[in-house]
Amino acid sequence: MMQTDVKSGHLNNSGFVVLGRNRLKAVSMVGTATAGTLDIFDTTTAPVAATYSRTAAVITVTKVAHGLVTGNVVGITFATASGSSGTNGNYTITRTGADTFTVTDINSGTIAGGTAATYSSLWLASYDTGASDLFGNFALIPGEGILAINGIYLSMSNLLSANIYYG
């Protein structure tokens, strides 16, 4: 059996942990008094903040001068509104205007416009902590881990810290 060295990275706010091809093996994070989220992207550029709405299974994303064209693939995460959210994942987009594009969600529902979304080249995983979860939370990724081609970026909201283990 071949051994693979595992490395680690630690952040206290959003940013890159490593650039280049790596496999994400495990994640740990510490929450705060407020519920938090860790979104992990495979990218060489920082994710872009946008807003979204959902009607049935169609999600409309709004970002001024987004620069995307129909057929581009984006990794996107969606904030929760009224107890519901879009499904985080990688989607092929349809450009509907200079400031809007749509994706088809695998789930459906209604979410009002103006709800936060974040997108980048590829989404890898998301983890949540509950309010007052001030303890270490650990997730071991099975198999060989999740392959990141470009680099690993952690988008952190209401987290004290996050560590990833990769190789």
Label every model-predicted segment.
Residues 46-123:
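Small/polar beta-strand repeat architecture
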Residues 1-47, 53, 75, 94-98, ...:
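Surface-exposed, low-hydrophobicity beta-strand/loop segments enriched in small/polar/acidic residues
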